[in-house]
Amino acid sequence: MKNKIIASLKERISRQNWENWFLDFNIRELKDNHVVFEVGNFFIKERLEKKFNKIISKVVKDILGKDATYEITFKEIPYETKVESGPLIKKRPLLITPLNPKYTFENLVVGEFNKFAYNVFLEASKNPGFYNPIFLYSGVGLGKTHLAQALGNYLLETDPDMKVAYLTSEEFMNEMFSAIKNGNIDEFREKYRKKADILIIDDIQFLIGIKSAQTELFHTFNTIHEAGKQIIICSDRTPQELKDFHSRMISRFQMGLLVKIEKPSSEDLFKIGKKISEMKNVEIDDEIIKYISKIYDNPRLIHGAILRLIAYRNLYGTLNLSIAESILTNVSKPPKSFEEKLLEILSEIFDCSPDDITSSKRTKNISYARKIGMYFAVKKLNLSTRDVGTIFKKSHSSVVQNVKQVEKLLKEGNVILKNYLKQIDKMSKGFAQGESM
C-alpha cells in the first residue's frame, strides 16, 4: 500500500517538482486510514504542505478512502553547539563571503548622527564578542552596510586567519534553499555555524514572513552565540517592528546591544560630500557640495549626485553651481521624496494615513492602496522591489506578489484599477519616471 501511494503521487507530480521536493519523501507510518509522511527537513515539509496539499490529500483519499488523513513530519537533526577542542592547525586565510575593501573605519565620516554606532563597532572590532549580538538599525542609505563591513575588514587586517561571513538575509535564504535542494544542508550549516568566526547578516527585514529561513537562522544564531563568536544584525527597523517574525528570534535580537544611526544633519551631509569627492580624487567647490547636502538627505543619494557631477565634468570639462543645479533638478527626485509623495497621494485617495499603508492592517481600502502603490512604485517610478519593500515595510516576496496581482487585474481590463492608477499618475505631477498613463 505504501508503494502504491508513492507511485500514484509520482504519476501526478511533474518530474522537475519531484526531483526538487520529493526525492527524500517517504512514508514513515501507515495506520488504519492515516498516513505519516517524512521528509528531510522543516523547509521541505512547509513547502509540500503549502504547494502540494491538494494532490497529496487526493491520492491518500483515493487509495485509503474518503475519510483518510495524512501528516508530514521531518527528520530532527540535532543542532551542535559544543565547540570541540583540538590541535590548532594554521590554515590559509579564508574569507567565507566577500567584503568590499572600500568600506573601512578610516573613510567613514563620523558625526553626531552615527558617533555612538561608530564607537560601538570600533570597540567590537578590537574585542569581538564583548557586545553580542549587535543589532544595528537606521533608515535607508545611512551607512549600516559600510559600518558592518568596516568591522569585518578591520578584523581581517589585524588577523588574516579570521573567518568573516557577511551576507544579506536574502543571500542567506537563497543559499539555504539551494543547499536543501542539492542535499548540501550539512555543508551549509558547517559553513556558518562552525567555520565562521563572525556572522554579519544585513537587511534582516527581508526574512519577514519566511518562517523556514527564520528557523534556520535561529539555530545558526544560537550555535554561534553559545560559542562566544560575534553576531551582527542590520535592519531598516527596530526588532519590535519586524512583524511576522518568530518571537524567539526577536528576543535574541533584543538580548544584545541595540544601536541606531540617526538622521544626519546638513553639516554631516556636507562632510560626507567632501569625503566622497576626496575619495574620488576630484575637487568640487564647497558651494556645490552645500547645495547637494540641502536637496539630498542621506549619504547614498549624495554619493550618486556627486558621481553624476563628476561624469558631467569629465565629459564637458567644466562644472559650476548653476550647472550642478540644472543637472540635479533635471533628474528624478530622491527615493525619500518618492516615498513621501507616493504615500501622501495613496492616503488621500484611499482615505487612510501613510502609517496605515505601511502597517500590517488588512482592511480592504488599506490593502488596495498598498497593492496599487507597490505596483506604481515598481512600474512607474522604476524602483527596485527591494526599495519598494523598504518603503512599504514589507518583504521582497510580498512586493513581487502584489505587483503580479495588479498586472493580472490590468490584463483582465479592470477599469476601476486603471482609473486609480491614472489618478495617482496625475496627482504625482511628474515626479514619476517613464511615460504617462
From Swiss-Prot:
It comes from Thermosipho melanesiensis (strain DSM 12029 / CIP 104789 / BI429). Residues 1-67 are annotated as: Domain I, interacts with DnaA modulators. Domain I is involved in oligomerization and binding regulators, domain II is flexibile and of varying length in different bacteria, domain III forms the AAA+ region, while domain IV binds dsDNA. ATP binds at residues 141, 143-145. This is Chromosomal replication initiator protein DnaA. Pfam families: Bac_DnaA, Bac_DnaA_C, DnaA_N. The gene is dnaA. One of its GO terms (cellular component) is plasma membrane. GO terms for biological process: DNA replication initiation; regulation of DNA replication. Keywords: ATP-binding, Cytoplasm, DNA replication, DNA-binding, Lipid-binding, Nucleotide-binding. Oligomerizes as a right-handed, spiral filament on DNA at oriC. Belongs to the DnaA family. Residues 67-97 are annotated as: Domain II. The keyword ATP-binding applies. Its main location: cytoplasm. It comes from the Bacteria. The lineage of its organism: Bacteria, Thermotogati, Thermotogota, Thermotogae, Thermotogales. CDD domains: AAA, Bac_DnaA_C. InterPro entries: AAA+_ATPase, Chromosome_initiator_DnaA, Chromosome_initiator_DnaA-like, DnaA_C, DnaA_dom, DnaA_N_dom, DnaA_N_sf, P-loop_NTPase. GO terms for molecular function: ATP binding; ATP hydrolysis activity; DNA replication origin binding; lipid binding.
